[in-house]
Amino acid sequence: MKSIYKKGAALAAAALMTVAFAGCGGGDKSASKGPKDTLTVGITNFADSLEPTDNYFGWQVMRYGVGECLVHFDSKMNAEPWIAESWKVSDDKMSWTFKIKDIKFSNGTPVTGEAVKKSIERTFAKAPRAKAMFELDHITADGQNVTIYTKKPIATLPGMLGDPLFIIVDVDSDGKVDFAKQGPIGTGPYMVKSFSKAKCELDANPNYYAAVPFKHLVINTIDDPNTRAMALQKGEIDIAVNVAAGDLALFQDKNKFNISSISSIRDVLARMNVKEGKPLADKRVRQALLRSLDRETYAKVLLKDTFIAGGPMLPPSLDYDFDGLMKAYPDKYNAESAKKLLEEAGWKDSDGDGFVDKDGKNLELDFIFYSGRAELPLYAEATQSDAKKVGIKINLKNVDYNVLDGIGVRGEYDLLISNILTEQAGDPEVFVNQYWKTNVDGSNPQNGSGYSNPEYDALSDQLASEFDPAKRRDIIIKMEKIVQDDAATLIFGYPQTNMVSNKSVQNANIYPCDYYWVTKDITPAK
């Protein structure tokens, strides 16, 4: 493991020097001599389409300031009005009625209850993920009111409709406008002028319901985090989203830069394929892998204390008894225990090659990762190094983000790492279901791992119809305990997230949910 740490430190140091030299004299080149009318942002981008119902591409539509939902999440992940000005649940808890603000789409078409109805129905028709979030019965519209009827009580429906999957679009324009290539007709402050995965150019929405601070917006895809930091240093961009931990030191001068950083509600986790016939189907092998990994050192050394070491499913930034679950966590780092568990499971190094084997085959695990987030390759390489010490061979496979979802759904992995929101609907319910609730005939397609626990499923069903916050909290904690006792997932750590801006702009702040990058609140500096 020392070689991995030295390698990581050397790469970070080299990147820092490169950016520092490249940035000499930089940092203020984007400041305009006259009024600033163009905002330029550097991001990492996984979307080659702006169709919001495809994959998770709605996130980019919202991040670019094109789309909005019925509800918005504040800095505490409370749902607040956005396109909807208010909402209420029926007495029987089987429907929710939303009152829609008198606003317009970017093409000037009014946003009515009927328009919202069509948009949500379109999402359900095109996106399997919508059906996995809640069971829709039907929708009615009456003027500026829209009522959503569900097949069973859904306590968190307003929050679910804050997921970018449910961006409200002008369905009648679909076909006249190619949503994938030209972007949907939404209600955000900006509208797409041109789009490619590498670059998106946008103009101010003339029909927006509030002042739009910039006439033009340019989104540059800069997937390499060091290059993204360099671009900000040189003044080529005004804002960099998610600067790597090793580069944050470059932006400490408060006269030139502003760093918005928060403890996120994200996990970096690896799904574990436990299907019959897979090595990780044996709980002892899963436990051995978990105990072989020194996650505390990863957080402190590789990631320079910008992560907290993992254990429970939900991060410490959320109120779900993190300390209690971490204290009870059974699979903390213990390499000797890992070796004993492998031996108990019948895995021994019979040929002296350094890897344990059984029936003539080494214990090998395919680890799928993508490099769009700087920490993922580091975690993957650290896993490979530490697992080798107990005799587990890890085969690393770097893939494009666009194929990651399909790999996960099909279960074509042993380990699959991702950086994911745990409270994407203002509540962890979607997260605790998507990878661990039993997938019955495609009912939960994100669970391609084969994991199934009847007690967990029963709690999930109970959670879906429970409206009392205290009882919901207790149910979720019980679900977390089941997964960690089953050694059913690998939580590497809980990251901070950040947005760094130069002094030509103000109010560039990151939110916990990571949906809101470009907003109407980001304005030219006064």
Q: At which residue positions do the language-model features occur?
A:
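Ligand-site clamp/hinge motif
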Residues: 205-250, 393-395, 400-401
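Surface-exposed binding/hinge segments that line
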Residues: 88, 92, 131-172
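Gly/Pro-rich hinge or "lid" segments in bacterial periplasmic/extracellular proteins
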Residues: 74-78, 162-212, 216, 334-336, ...
